Amino acid sequence: MSLGEFAQSRSLTLGVELELQIVNTHDYDLAPSAVDLLRLMERHKVPGSVVPEMTDSMIELSTGICTDYDDALSQLREIRDALVSCAAQLNVGLCGGGTHPFQDWSQRRIFNKPRFQELSQLYGYLSKQFTIFGQHVHVGCPGPDQALVLLHGLSRFIPHLIALSASSPFVQGTDTGFDSARLNSVFAFPMSGRAPFVQTWDDFNVYFNKMTRTGVIKSMKDFYWDIRPKPEYGTIEVRVLDTPLTVEKAAAMAGYIQCLARWLRVEKPFELNEDDYLPYTYNRFQACRFGLDGIFVDPQTGEHRTLRDDILASFDKLELHAMELRAEGAINYLRADLLRIGNDASWIRHINDEEHLLAEVVRQQCQRWAGQGR
């Protein structure tokens, strides 16, 4: 089986996907209302799409192609407003967050769609435990070789993206000690982790054909890599972010990734080397476990810094690129948010410390998603 052609795509355009929680407004547990919500959304003409996800207590929204941060924010707000209106008609709530803090995974139902049913047969209980919620960001690439170079360049910022977006400290009613517990569920899948270190599309085709011949995978969808090429869109897809609590944060994360991509493309700050991946798993664990307080090991120098400090330093490096991309608002939002509260995991823990009730935490998450909370 061949990968086929890598589609033409305008460089540095964006696409944003968000997986959302559907909760009831009685006790704020997950609600199996995806079918009804999708039916109501058919009456709304919005950019992008809203589609089912693995279980019937979640949905995925996607923007259309976005030129910049403001475009992404505008599209996300328009889709958000339509979804909130439809949810109100069903007396359910919608919220961000990488995990629902107290849902019982065994009560989940797989959405009635052939691919989801097939995955359920293959992965068993892991499929129901995959009721987790992430943000994916697509970045347009002018060609396949450039896409792979960008993929490997962005890989050193995977811990930064995890720490900034982390919003999943609670699982099954328990504080896990992780800022992003969601990714622990992803790591359970056999094709998760990082992409192989190949830098040309021809070499990637060779790898892909070897994998399909083994019967381990059938298509690119079977790879759950942190970043993967998306040839049919002409993009790379960054997949490690927890779903933020607001569309503003989601758009800002997309803007940050766009700025990093331009910085890597224009300044070429380092040469790619497979040894750069030596601290990759350690850095990723530090980001998941400790968030912004995690330690980042620079793959070139071996220097140890906190992710908080390295992220703030990256904002300074990206200043001119943010101006060129009209993404200053994204960087300013993330800097202010980092200095004020940290990340969404910190906010969730703070509200739980105040309220001592996870249902109230979810209620306030719904308010924030609707643009009404603190």
From Swiss-Prot:
Disulfide bonds: none annotated. One of its GO terms (biological process) is modified amino acid biosynthetic process. GO terms for molecular function: ATP binding; glutamate-cysteine ligase activity. It catalyses: L-cysteine + L-glutamate + ATP = gamma-L-glutamyl-L-cysteine + ADP + phosphate + H(+). Coiled coil: none annotated. Its EC number is 6.3.2.2. It is an enzyme of class 6 (ligase). Keywords: ATP-binding, Ligase, Nucleotide-binding. It comes from the Bacteria. The keyword RNA-binding does not apply. Transmembrane segments: none annotated. Pfam families: GCS2 (PF04107). The keyword Ligase applies. NCBIfam families: gshA_cyan_rel, PRK13516.1. ATP-dependent carboxylate-amine ligase which exhibits weak glutamate--cysteine ligase activity. Belongs to the glutamate--cysteine ligase type 2 family. YbdK subfamily. This is Putative glutamate--cysteine ligase 2. It comes from Leptothrix cholodnii (strain ATCC 51168 / LMG 8142 / SP-6).
